[in-house]
Design a protein with these regions (language model features):
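Active-site cofactor/cluster-binding pocket
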Residues: 1-153
Length: 153
């Protein structure tokens, strides 16, 4: 099996932990796995991207643009930012609840993620998760990455 999975979000959402769990599960199933993270601003709220390449053919742990089979996005704007990594007929799993960047919090530009979700629906096959509602049911924001991994399964 060859599969390229890109996870993206912002610092503090559990993106890296989710990628490590996927990689670990794939290795336990006997697959060769390459993974890497690119973490922007190295702080809560900075952009985080995790690359997971499952299969023998991967020469690099970084997924080239146009090669990802699945994009798992913990934040709508990060999903749009990382769309160029997807190949045709890929799937996007995205949390519809936005994390407002500092600039939005200061300027109140009205960012609520709805325009990003509408754009994503036009560009890819999407599974939209209402993060806010799911977290209320789960009772803890700390388990959201597990909810997203359930959607991947």
């Amino acid at each position: 099996m060859n599969k390229d999975i890109l996870l993206c979000g912002v610092g503090g959402q559990g993106t890296v932990l989710a990628s490590k769990l996927i990689a670990s599960a794939a290795m336990r199933c006997g697959n060769v796995v390459h993974s890497a993270e690119t973490i922007g601003m190295a702080q809560r709220g900075g952009s985080v991207i995790s690359h997971i390449r499952i299969g023998e053919r991967a020469a690099s742990p970084l997924i080239p643009r146009g090669n990802a089979d699945i994009l798992i996005a913990f934040e709508p704007a990060e999903a749009v930012r990382n769309l160029p990594y997807l190949k045709k007929e890929s799937v996007v799993i995205v949390n519809s609840t936005p994390v407002k960047p500092t600039t939005e919090a200061l300027q109140e530009t009205g960012y609520d993620g709805t325009e990003m979700i509408a754009y994503l629906k036009k560009k890819a096959d999407c599974v939209i998760l209402d993060g806010e509602a799911l977290l209320k049911k789960a009772g803890s924001a700390r388990c959201f990455n597990m909810i997203v991994l359930g959607a991947l399964a």
